[in-house]
Every structure is written in structure tokens, then in C-alpha cells.
Amino acid sequence: MAFVLSEEQQMLRDSARSFADERLPISQLRVLRAKGEGFDGTTWREMAELGFIGVLIPEEFGGSAFGYIGLGQVLEAQGRTIAASPLLSTALIGASAFVIAGSQAQKETYLPQIASGDLIMALAVDEGPHHDPSHISLTATKSAGGYTLSGDKRYVVDGVEAGLLIVAARTSGGESDANGITLFLVQGDAKGVSRTPLKTLDAHAAVGGAPLLDRRGLQFARSCARNHRWHFGGDIPHIRA
């Protein structure tokens, strides 16, 4: 099967490559790494103005609706320069979650914020050293006003700067049961969320954390020997997606 880009897709590809070469060179990654920063906010805003962040988002929510082929051109362009940006976690994973599974209210609230570059997202799934989305032990139990999430997540890409998290939590079943997993929306600054930056080979911004909740969901501070994790605890209202 022949794969040929449309004229508009070719223009998007060329624009994305030019931008990545000029504004997201590998030298920028080295500077950010030296500063301990995950990405440059000014460059991210420029990406939003050029429409790169809203490629998957319908026009009614501020995007350009170029689809996955279009976004693929932007991702490929940034991959060529090892660009430091939360494009994958926000423009692909975050936007897809709302476009595919979000309620109308969630789309109206979050998609415009993603397209404008105002909202950075992160997906918190893995809990062990390897990717295994069915192995979830972080629990979500019903409580007054919503749910209480308690547990740890590892290697949350772009989690350092994320304002909104998509968290996979277990609402039923056993630890390795493929069923009984629910996705929750959690504000990055929610009470009970603790983040610890991780050093990665490509200097990309990922996080871990430390537990701050006991079994009853009441906050207290305690030390923990486990590193490279992200802990969630506290009552999370309005959130199942």
C-alpha cells in the first residue's frame, strides 16, 4: 500500500522540520539538561501558535484536526533533533484521551487549554521497571466527594511540569488483572501528590515520588526508602474518564 502525504500534510511536515531545526536543536537539549529543566516554555508557546500542539484537536476546540498522520509528521520532525518538549505526553496522549473518551464537558474544558499550550499533561501508568499496563496496584477507593487514590507510579514522562495527570488506578480485581482499571484525572498540584524528578538517559523530564498517605487516606509525612516513584493520595473529585 502506497503512503503518500497530501499537500497540506507535506506543508505541515516541512514547517515542523524547519521549526525543529531552528528552535529545537540538540544544543537546546544540552542547555536545558545543564539547567535541570525539562523544556523551554517560550518555545512551547511558539509551537502552540503554529498549531503543532492542536493537530489532533477538532477545530471547534481550537485545534486543526490534521489527525494522527499530521501529528506523526510533527513528532518525527522533533525526533530528528531529540527535541525537549512535552508534545508526546500532551498533544498525543492527553489530547487523544479527551477526543476518544472524554465527555463533552471535559472536551470543552481541556482541549482548548491543550491547543493553546496552557495545559501540559502526563500519563501515569507504570509502577515497575518495565511497561506493563495490566499490572496496576495503585488503588482507588470511594470516599466523600469522589475517590481516594493511594500508591506509587514510576517514570511518568513530563510529569515534572504536568498540570493535569491521567492516572491508571485499580477499582476492582487483583494486582495483575487486566480488568478493573479506571483512568482518573488528577490535578498536578492536588493535595497528596508528591513528585521526585528522575535523571534519564536523554534528559527528558520524568518523575518519581514518595508516599504521603496512610491506609485511611489521611495525610502524614514519613520517610520512604523506595525511590523513582510518584505517589498519589487524597480525595479526587469529579474525575473518572
Model regions and ranges:
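Glycine-rich beta->alpha junctions and the first turn(s) of the following alpha-helix
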Residues: 2-14, 80, 193-241
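Internal helix-loop-helix
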Residues: 49-108, 112-117, 157-164
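A short, Trp-centered hydrophobic/proline-enriched beta-strand micro-motif
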Residues: 117-128
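A structural signal for short hydrophobic beta-strand segments in well-ordered beta-sheet cores
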Residues: 138-141
